[in-house]
């Protein structure tokens, strides 16, 4: 496999001829909407207690926890890059953050950290100091997050711009 770096994250190019997922990739990549949505309820009682004990914002801590878990699953780290399938060593985060003064959200990109405390601290600083609502296109080497804590829902859909190179998971909760 060939190696490379995209926006700070290392990846390996996948040899499609020997890849066990080749047929699936070819079939679903040509679909109009190749994504699917999985919704479920998750009991976060103990996690909320842990977050509160450490005085962390729940959203930032939950983004870390989900990213840590998904980075451990190889299938979540596959992406398309320049027409090829690549496997990233790790994936960073991109999340919406509500600016309370303007009541508009901004998209904030934060690199994954090795501890929840470091991540939460960096996420807070980055979100609060970022003045732009959009800093540019969301890269492939991120998981996208959107929290809607003031509502309860069991399904959500997203704007689909039709870019087949974008294959990153999107996590939402409320």
Where are these regions (language model features)?
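N-terminal amphipathic/basic-hydrophobic helices that include classical n-h-c signal peptides
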Residues: 1-5
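Flexible, Gly/Pro-enriched loop and linker segments at secondary-structure and domain junctions
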Residues: 6-39, 59, 145-146, 153-174
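Conserved GHKL (Bergerat-fold) ATPase module
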Residues: 11-12, 31, 91, 124, ...
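Residues forming anionic-ligand binding surfaces in small-molecule and nucleic-acid pockets
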Residues: 39-41, 45
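Acyl activation and transfer enzymes in specialized metabolism, enriched
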Residues: 47-73
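Helical lid/core segments from catalytic subdomains that handle acyl or acyl-like groups
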Residues: 99-158
